[in-house]
Protein backbone atom coordinates (compact mmCIF):
# COMPACT_ATOMS: atom_id res chain seq x y z
CA UNK A 1 0.00 0.00 0.00
CA UNK A 2 1.14 3.57 -0.58
CA UNK A 3 2.39 5.23 2.59
CA UNK A 4 1.88 8.77 1.35
CA UNK A 5 -1.65 10.14 1.23
CA UNK A 6 -2.51 10.54 -2.43
CA UNK A 7 -4.60 13.65 -3.03
CA UNK A 8 -4.09 14.48 -6.70
CA UNK A 9 -3.21 12.08 -9.53
CA UNK A 10 -2.81 12.16 -13.28
CA UNK A 11 -3.57 9.10 -15.38
CA UNK A 12 -1.99 8.69 -18.78
CA UNK A 13 -4.47 6.41 -20.58
CA UNK A 14 -3.58 4.90 -23.94
CA UNK A 15 -6.12 5.21 -26.72
CA UNK A 16 -6.05 1.43 -26.97
CA UNK A 17 -7.78 1.29 -23.59
CA UNK A 18 -10.93 2.51 -25.37
CA UNK A 19 -10.82 0.00 -28.22
CA UNK A 20 -11.76 -3.67 -28.20
CA UNK A 21 -9.35 -4.38 -31.05
CA UNK A 22 -12.02 -4.37 -33.75
CA UNK A 23 -10.83 -2.05 -36.51
CA UNK A 24 -14.42 -0.96 -37.11
CA UNK A 25 -15.01 -0.17 -33.42
CA UNK A 26 -12.44 2.44 -32.46
CA UNK A 27 -14.25 3.35 -29.24
CA UNK A 28 -15.83 0.36 -27.51
CA UNK A 29 -18.92 1.03 -25.42
CA UNK A 30 -17.80 -1.63 -22.94
CA UNK A 31 -14.27 -0.23 -22.62
CA UNK A 32 -15.52 3.35 -22.31
CA UNK A 33 -18.06 2.36 -19.64
CA UNK A 34 -15.37 0.56 -17.65
CA UNK A 35 -13.05 3.56 -17.75
CA UNK A 36 -15.81 5.94 -16.65
CA UNK A 37 -16.85 3.65 -13.79
CA UNK A 38 -13.28 3.37 -12.55
CA UNK A 39 -12.65 7.10 -12.75
CA UNK A 40 -15.75 7.59 -10.60
CA UNK A 41 -14.43 5.15 -7.98
CA UNK A 42 -11.13 7.01 -7.67
CA UNK A 43 -12.83 10.41 -7.57
CA UNK A 44 -15.26 9.18 -4.90
CA UNK A 45 -12.27 8.16 -2.78
CA UNK A 46 -11.55 11.88 -2.36
CA UNK A 47 -8.78 11.92 -4.96
CA UNK A 48 -8.49 14.74 -7.50
CA UNK A 49 -8.28 13.19 -10.97
CA UNK A 50 -6.69 14.50 -14.14
CA UNK A 51 -6.03 12.40 -17.21
CA UNK A 52 -4.18 12.61 -20.48
CA UNK A 53 -5.72 10.43 -23.18
CA UNK A 54 -3.88 8.99 -26.16
CA UNK A 55 -5.23 8.50 -29.66
CA UNK A 56 -3.69 5.23 -30.79
CA UNK A 57 -7.06 3.52 -31.17
CA UNK A 58 -7.80 5.99 -33.99
CA UNK A 59 -4.43 6.93 -35.44
CA UNK A 60 -0.74 6.82 -34.54
CA UNK A 61 1.14 9.78 -35.96
CA UNK A 62 4.55 8.18 -36.49
CA UNK A 63 3.10 4.96 -37.93
CA UNK A 64 0.88 6.88 -40.33
CA UNK A 65 3.80 9.04 -41.39
CA UNK A 66 5.81 5.96 -42.34
CA UNK A 67 3.05 3.86 -43.92
CA UNK A 68 1.16 6.57 -45.85
CA UNK A 69 4.10 8.83 -46.64
CA UNK A 70 2.46 11.71 -44.79
CA UNK A 71 4.73 14.49 -43.56
CA UNK A 72 5.74 13.73 -39.95
CA UNK A 73 4.47 17.07 -38.66
CA UNK A 74 1.06 16.56 -40.29
CA UNK A 75 0.88 12.97 -39.08
CA UNK A 76 1.62 13.99 -35.49
CA UNK A 77 -1.01 16.72 -35.69
CA UNK A 78 -3.51 14.14 -36.94
CA UNK A 79 -2.60 11.99 -33.94
CA UNK A 80 -3.24 14.95 -31.64
CA UNK A 81 -6.69 15.39 -33.16
CA UNK A 82 -7.37 11.72 -32.41
CA UNK A 83 -6.78 12.41 -28.71
CA UNK A 84 -9.37 15.19 -28.85
CA UNK A 85 -11.94 12.78 -30.30
CA UNK A 86 -11.29 10.38 -27.42
CA UNK A 87 -11.44 13.24 -24.92
CA UNK A 88 -14.82 14.37 -26.22
CA UNK A 89 -16.14 10.82 -25.81
CA UNK A 90 -14.86 10.69 -22.23
CA UNK A 91 -16.27 14.11 -21.35
CA UNK A 92 -19.74 13.28 -22.63
CA UNK A 93 -19.74 9.86 -20.95
CA UNK A 94 -18.72 11.41 -17.63
CA UNK A 95 -21.43 14.04 -17.98
CA UNK A 96 -24.00 11.30 -18.58
CA UNK A 97 -22.91 9.78 -15.26
CA UNK A 98 -23.24 13.17 -13.51
CA UNK A 99 -19.48 13.49 -13.06
CA UNK A 100 -18.40 17.14 -13.43
CA UNK A 101 -15.46 17.49 -15.77
CA UNK A 102 -13.39 19.94 -17.76
CA UNK A 103 -12.33 19.01 -21.29
CA UNK A 104 -9.16 20.86 -22.29
CA UNK A 105 -7.03 21.04 -25.40
CA UNK A 106 -3.40 22.11 -25.60
CA UNK A 107 -4.18 23.71 -28.97
CA UNK A 108 -7.04 26.13 -29.51
CA UNK A 109 -10.32 24.43 -30.55
CA UNK A 110 -12.81 26.81 -28.90
CA UNK A 111 -15.95 25.12 -30.19
CA UNK A 112 -14.83 21.71 -28.93
CA UNK A 113 -12.75 22.14 -25.78
CA UNK A 114 -11.38 24.80 -23.46
CA UNK A 115 -7.83 25.90 -24.14
CA UNK A 116 -5.64 24.28 -21.49
CA UNK A 117 -4.58 26.66 -18.73
CA UNK A 118 -2.67 25.23 -15.74
CA UNK A 119 -4.31 27.48 -13.15
CA UNK A 120 -7.84 26.90 -14.45
CA UNK A 121 -7.19 23.16 -14.62
CA UNK A 122 -5.83 23.13 -11.06
CA UNK A 123 -8.83 25.10 -9.81
CA UNK A 124 -11.17 22.65 -11.55
CA UNK A 125 -9.43 19.74 -9.82
CA UNK A 126 -9.83 21.45 -6.45
CA UNK A 127 -13.54 21.80 -7.21
CA UNK A 128 -13.86 18.04 -7.74
CA UNK A 129 -13.95 18.07 -11.52
CA UNK A 130 -12.21 15.42 -13.60
CA UNK A 131 -9.83 17.28 -15.89
CA UNK A 132 -9.33 15.72 -19.34
CA UNK A 133 -6.23 16.90 -21.19
CA UNK A 134 -6.07 16.34 -24.94
CA UNK A 135 -3.73 17.19 -27.84
CA UNK A 136 -0.72 15.80 -25.99
CA UNK A 137 2.16 18.24 -25.63
CA UNK A 138 0.71 20.39 -28.42
CA UNK A 139 3.71 20.01 -30.73
CA UNK A 140 4.94 17.41 -33.23
CA UNK A 141 7.81 15.06 -32.38
CA UNK A 142 6.73 14.98 -28.72
CA UNK A 143 4.96 11.91 -27.36
CA UNK A 144 1.80 11.76 -25.28
CA UNK A 145 4.02 10.52 -22.43
CA UNK A 146 5.85 13.84 -22.55
CA UNK A 147 2.55 15.70 -22.65
CA UNK A 148 1.40 13.77 -19.59
CA UNK A 149 4.62 14.58 -17.74
CA UNK A 150 4.22 18.28 -18.56
CA UNK A 151 0.65 18.29 -17.24
CA UNK A 152 1.74 16.35 -14.13
CA UNK A 153 4.40 18.97 -13.37
CA UNK A 154 2.08 21.92 -14.00
CA UNK A 155 -0.72 20.46 -11.88
CA UNK A 156 1.66 19.34 -9.11
CA UNK A 157 0.19 15.86 -8.87
CA UNK A 158 1.35 13.32 -6.30
CA UNK A 159 1.88 10.60 -8.90
CA UNK A 160 1.67 10.07 -12.65
CA UNK A 161 0.04 6.73 -13.43
CA UNK A 162 0.65 5.29 -16.89
CA UNK A 163 -1.94 2.67 -17.86
CA UNK A 164 -0.95 0.29 -20.64
CA UNK A 165 -2.75 -2.62 -22.27
CA UNK A 166 0.23 -4.84 -23.13
CA UNK A 167 2.70 -4.95 -20.22
CA UNK A 168 2.36 -4.73 -16.44
CA UNK A 169 5.34 -2.53 -15.71
CA UNK A 170 8.92 -1.78 -16.68
CA UNK A 171 11.13 -4.72 -17.70
CA UNK A 172 14.85 -5.04 -18.33
CA UNK A 173 13.95 -6.33 -21.82
CA UNK A 174 10.81 -6.33 -23.95
CA UNK A 175 8.67 -9.09 -22.34
CA UNK A 176 6.81 -9.59 -25.61
CA UNK A 177 10.06 -10.64 -27.26
CA UNK A 178 12.12 -12.09 -24.39
CA UNK A 179 10.61 -14.83 -22.23
CA UNK A 180 13.23 -14.28 -19.52
CA UNK A 181 12.57 -10.54 -19.17
CA UNK A 182 12.49 -9.39 -15.54
CA UNK A 183 10.02 -6.82 -14.25
CA UNK A 184 11.16 -4.12 -11.85
CA UNK A 185 9.03 -3.38 -8.79
CA UNK A 186 10.97 -0.14 -8.48
CA UNK A 187 13.63 1.60 -10.52
CA UNK A 188 15.17 5.04 -10.06
CA UNK A 189 14.80 7.73 -12.68
CA UNK A 190 18.54 7.71 -13.33
CA UNK A 191 18.77 3.93 -13.70
CA UNK A 192 15.83 3.98 -16.11
CA UNK A 193 17.58 6.57 -18.26
CA UNK A 194 21.05 5.03 -18.08
CA UNK A 195 19.72 1.62 -19.13
CA UNK A 196 17.90 3.11 -22.10
CA UNK A 197 14.62 1.42 -21.21
CA UNK A 198 11.92 2.17 -23.76
CA UNK A 199 8.69 1.73 -21.80
CA UNK A 200 8.30 5.47 -21.25
CA UNK A 201 9.67 8.41 -23.22
CA UNK A 202 12.96 9.52 -21.60
CA UNK A 203 11.88 13.17 -21.89
CA UNK A 204 8.90 12.34 -19.65
CA UNK A 205 11.19 10.63 -17.14
CA UNK A 206 13.51 13.64 -17.05
CA UNK A 207 10.64 16.07 -16.45
CA UNK A 208 9.23 14.00 -13.58
CA UNK A 209 12.70 13.51 -12.09
CA UNK A 210 13.26 17.27 -12.00
CA UNK A 211 9.85 17.83 -10.38
CA UNK A 212 10.17 14.86 -8.01
CA UNK A 213 6.95 13.27 -9.29
CA UNK A 214 6.93 9.45 -9.11
CA UNK A 215 5.62 7.48 -12.07
CA UNK A 216 3.75 4.21 -11.75
CA UNK A 217 3.36 2.07 -14.87
CA UNK A 218 0.75 -0.68 -14.67
CA UNK A 219 -1.45 -2.92 -16.78
CA UNK A 220 -4.99 -1.61 -17.24
CA UNK A 221 -5.85 -5.04 -18.62
CA UNK A 222 -5.02 -6.60 -15.21
CA UNK A 223 -5.67 -3.88 -12.66
CA UNK A 224 -8.27 -1.23 -11.93
CA UNK A 225 -7.46 2.44 -11.63
CA UNK A 226 -8.26 2.23 -7.91
CA UNK A 227 -5.71 -0.56 -7.47
CA UNK A 228 -3.14 1.49 -9.35
CA UNK A 229 -3.63 4.44 -7.01
CA UNK A 230 -3.77 2.63 -3.68
CA UNK A 231 -2.06 -0.76 -4.11
CA UNK A 232 1.38 -2.09 -4.96
CA UNK A 233 1.07 -2.97 -8.64
CA UNK A 234 3.27 -2.49 -11.69
CA UNK A 235 6.54 -0.57 -11.49
CA UNK A 236 7.29 2.63 -9.60
CA UNK A 237 9.89 4.99 -11.07
CA UNK A 238 11.15 7.46 -8.50
CA UNK A 239 14.18 8.53 -6.52
CA UNK A 240 12.80 7.00 -3.31
CA UNK A 241 14.40 3.80 -2.07
CA UNK A 242 11.94 0.92 -2.36
CA UNK A 243 9.52 2.87 -4.49
CA UNK A 244 7.25 4.04 -1.67
CA UNK A 245 5.17 6.98 -2.82
UniProtKB/Swiss-Prot annotation:
InterPro entries: AceGlu_kinase-like_sf, Asp/Glu/Uridylate_kinase, Uridylate_kinase, Uridylate_kinase_bac
One cellular component term from this protein's GO annotations in UniProt: cytoplasm
Main location: cytoplasm
Recorded catalytic activity of this chain's protein: UMP + ATP = UDP + ADP
Residues annotated for ATP binding in this entry: 12-15, 56, 60, 164, 171, 174
Documented activity regulation: Inhibited by UTP.
Keyword match Transmembrane helix: no
Annotated metabolic or biological route of this protein: Pyrimidine metabolism; CTP biosynthesis via de novo pathway; UDP from UMP (UMPK route): step 1/1
GO molecular function: ATP binding; UMP kinase activity
Pfam families (UniProt xref): AA_kinase
First-level EC class: transferase
Location in the cell: Cytoplasm
Residues annotated for UMP binding in this entry: 55, 76, 137-144
UniProt keyword annotation of NAD present: no
GO biological process, one term: UDP biosynthetic process
Sorted UniProt keywords: ATP-binding, Cytoplasm, Kinase, Nucleotide-binding, Pyrimidine biosynthesis, Transferase
EC number: 2.7.4.22
The organism's place on the tree of life at top rank: Bacteria
Subunit structure, as described in the record: Homohexamer.
Family: Belongs to the UMP kinase family.
PANTHER family referenced in this protein's UniProt entry, alphabetically: URIDYLATE KINASE, URIDYLATE KINASE PUMPKIN, CHLOROPLASTIC
Protein purpose: Catalyzes the reversible phosphorylation of UMP to UDP.
Protein name as catalogued: Uridylate kinase
Amino acid sequence: MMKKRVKRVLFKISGEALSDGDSSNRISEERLSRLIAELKVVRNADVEVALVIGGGNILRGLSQSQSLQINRVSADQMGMLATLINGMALADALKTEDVPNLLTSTLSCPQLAELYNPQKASDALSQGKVVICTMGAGAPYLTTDTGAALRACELKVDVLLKATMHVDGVYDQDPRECADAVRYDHISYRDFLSQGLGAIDPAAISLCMEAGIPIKMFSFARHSLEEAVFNTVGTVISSTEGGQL
